[in-house]
Amino acid sequence: MPKIALRNPLDGFKKAVDQASARLQAEVFHGPIGRAVSETPKTGWVAKGIARLGLTAFKPAPPPPVLKRPVVMITGLTMEAASYDPMAKHLASNSANGKVAVYVVADGKFHDGGVNGKVLTDAQAAKTRMFQIQYTDVKGAPSDKEPQLERAFRAIQRATHAPALDVVAHSAGCTDFRLYLDRRPAADRSIGINEAVFIGPASHGTFMGNVGNAVGRPIGVEKAGTELEIGSPLVQHLNDGWAGQRNQVKGDVTILGISGAPTPGKGGVSNGDGFMPVNQLDMAHAHTIVLKGSDPTPVAHLMQVGYSGVIAEVQKRLAQ
């Protein structure tokens, strides 16, 4: 008798979740909501209202500087490379910075402007100073993504021949990057890191990781949740070894947080971005800046990479 392939009843659910996530990210970063809160200049009564309310997360982003070094943009859990498009678009408005190139780990190539853009040679990729990374699986755990970062950093250094790179990482992407610093081979330590900016990092784990560990299997984030949850062995290992990671960053490590949403964490619920409490971001020898937001939901954590106030703070660091 021929074998009958049985479908996993969860496959349809996972597909629906993935499609919903893609639609949400498209709206967040490219729809009217994303445009309203990102790099769009805030003028007139809008600027006055933002200033009066002290909503520093939405302060205007000044014209971008010329970037000092190539910038590597590392995404958070479930986030596509395009989540950095608002920031990249703003920085690219200074023509000296070039257009963004996306390193797609799955094919090991640079693509022009997006994951489906034309393939670039190393010489063509070297004309930009902005590099997004598209993981093979955006729901992967830090231990799965770290080897992919090794390949990406090698490729970017090979193309640019830059003595040092700057890094902007978001959410779990900060954990991915820290694990890269922790594990990268001695030969890769010649790839210098100058400035590092962490946006909404899970510095000491995140309660959302605990949730993912408990109920994340149907949507494929159980392993990531296990590694990112508060008190996980990976988080403890990285925090115990933070000094070694910090020493590999020649310049400053800047942590950006957003307030305005009730956020669960160690010790209960406090102020944060819905995922990360602002009182649990700090790390030794890093400078923490908290910007005031207005979204009382966890959507703030997803959207913050496109907030004009965040872009303003990031570009300050990239001009150092």
Model regions: which residues?
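Short, compositionally biased, intrinsically disordered N-terminal export/targeting signals
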Residues: 1-15
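Lipid deacylating catalytic domains
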Residues: 12, 24-320
